[in-house]
Each structure stands twice: as C-alpha cells, then as structure tokens.
C-alpha cells in the first residue's frame, strides 16, 4: 500500500472516527463539509484512498465504504533528536508506527523521534528509545520537551523564570543550558517513551 498525503491521512482518520461514532461511514458531502472542500474534491480523496488500498467502496451506493487499513493510531517517525548537546535534528519521514490510542491526545498532532545520547537517562529516556511528542508550542515547568534553539533541536526538561529558559538534562554529569525565552521554540512535549528490549 502506498503512502498517504497529509490530507488523505486526515480524511481517512475522519472516516474511521465517523464510523466509530455513528456506526456507518460519512457521505461525500459530509467529508467535503468537514474539510471545507467541494464534493468533487472529497470524491478525489476517496478515489485516492481506494487506489492505495485503505478503503473499499461499492459503486453507486452512498455511504457504502469500509476501511481496510487503519491509520488512526499510526504516528510518523520523523528522525532523530539529540539528548545531549544540542544538534541539528535529522528530520525525514522514516516510517509510521502504531501506538496505543491511550497515548494520543485528541485534537493534537503527534510524532516520534529516535533519541541519540544520554542526557535524559535519569528520566529513563535512553539512547535508541523512541519518544512520542505531542506537538505544541508551549510548556510548563518540569515538562520534558523537544526544543529548538538557533535551528538546533534538543530533548530536555523545561523551566522558565521570567525572560530566561533553562533546558535541563536529566543526567548529573551534564550541565543545564540557559537561553533568553525568545530564542527557544518549543516543538512539543514528550508524552510517551517506547523501547525495544
């Protein structure tokens, strides 16, 4: 089965959630209304989903479709993040990985990053782990975040005091980093850690 565009993925998730809630699939018009596109645009998304093997439809019958491959709990793995010195993140779509739905917050995008380094070992985040990030541009003190500073990304605990931000490692062998708040961009908060044994 071929990869989906972001919009096709969103349409497929909408179809799955609609079926869960109502017991039947949405109409073409309901899909069009939800995504603020024309019915023809919605129809083209359905054709693409069918060609890629994610849904099956019966010609000529409204609402006669079923999902053949779920993507609802599949999250993109988009590269590596350094848990050590801040480094340029390597961002590219490696794969989609299924995660338990209980880890996903409704209304938020999520992504996975592979951890490189040992600055977060006292929080049980180790080299090679996958961290599940809930995409958000804010954090509370003590949150573990993926943060960008001057184009480089790091995984640290976040603390803000006035105009200063501390990005603190969870490894007593390493020192915290301090920056003006306007130099730190929060990419998201860690909401899960996955490890192969």
Swiss-Prot record:
The active site is at residues 119, 156. It comes from Thermotoga neapolitana. Homodimer. The keyword DNA damage applies. Its EC number is 3.4.21.88. Belongs to the peptidase S24 family. SUPFAM superfamilies: LexA/Signal peptidase (SSF51306), Winged helix' DNA-binding domain (SSF46785). Represses a number of genes involved in the response to DNA damage (SOS response), including recA and lexA. In the presence of single-stranded DNA, RecA interacts with LexA causing an autocatalytic cleavage which disrupts the DNA-binding part of LexA, leading to derepression of the SOS regulon and eventually DNA repair. InterPro entries: LexA (IPR006200), LexA-like (IPR039418), LexA/Signal_pep-like_sf (IPR036286), LexA_DNA-bd_dom (IPR006199), LexA_repressor (IPR050077), Peptidase_S24_LexA (IPR006197), Peptidase_S24_S26A/B/C (IPR015927), WH-like_DNA-bd_sf (IPR036388). Transmembrane segments: none annotated. Disulfide bonds: none annotated. The record marks 83-84 as: Cleavage. The keyword ATP-binding does not apply. It catalyses: Hydrolysis of Ala-|-Gly bond in repressor LexA. This is LexA repressor. Keywords: Autocatalytic cleavage, DNA damage, DNA repair, DNA replication, DNA-binding, Hydrolase, Repressor, SOS response, Transcription, Transcription regulation. GO terms for biological process: DNA repair; DNA replication; negative regulation of DNA-templated transcription; proteolysis; SOS response. GO terms for molecular function: DNA binding; serine-type endopeptidase activity. No consensus sequence similar to the SOS-box from E.coli or from B.subtilis was found upstream of the lexA gene, suggesting the presence of another target sequence specific for the Thermotogales. Residues 28-47 bind DNA.
């Amino acid at each position: 089965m071929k990869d989906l565009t972001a919009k096709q993925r969103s349409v497929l998730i909408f179809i799955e959630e609609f079926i869960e809630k109502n017991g039947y699939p949405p109409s073409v018009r309901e899909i069009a209304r939800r995504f603020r596109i024309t019915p023809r645009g919605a129809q083209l998304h359905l054709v693409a989903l069918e060609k890629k093997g994610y849904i099956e439809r019966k010609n000529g019958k409204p609402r006669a479709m079923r999902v053949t491959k779920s993507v609802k709990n599949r999250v993109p793995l988009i590269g590596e993040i350094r848990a050590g010195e801040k480094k340029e993140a390597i961002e590219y779509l490696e794969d989609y990985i299924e995660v338990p739905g209980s880890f996903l917050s409704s209304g938020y995008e999520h992504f996975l990053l592979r951890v490189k380094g040992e600055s977060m070992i006292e929080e049980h985040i180790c080299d090679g782990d996958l961290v599940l990030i809930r995409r958000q541009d804010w954090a509370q003190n003590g949150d573990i975040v993926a943060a960008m500073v001057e184009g480089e990304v790091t995984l640290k605990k976040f603390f803000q005091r006035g105009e200063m931000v501390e990005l603190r490692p969870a490894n007593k062998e390493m020192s915290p980093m301090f920056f003006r708040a306007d130099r730190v961009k929060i990419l998201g908060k860690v909401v899960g850690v996955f490890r192969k044994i």
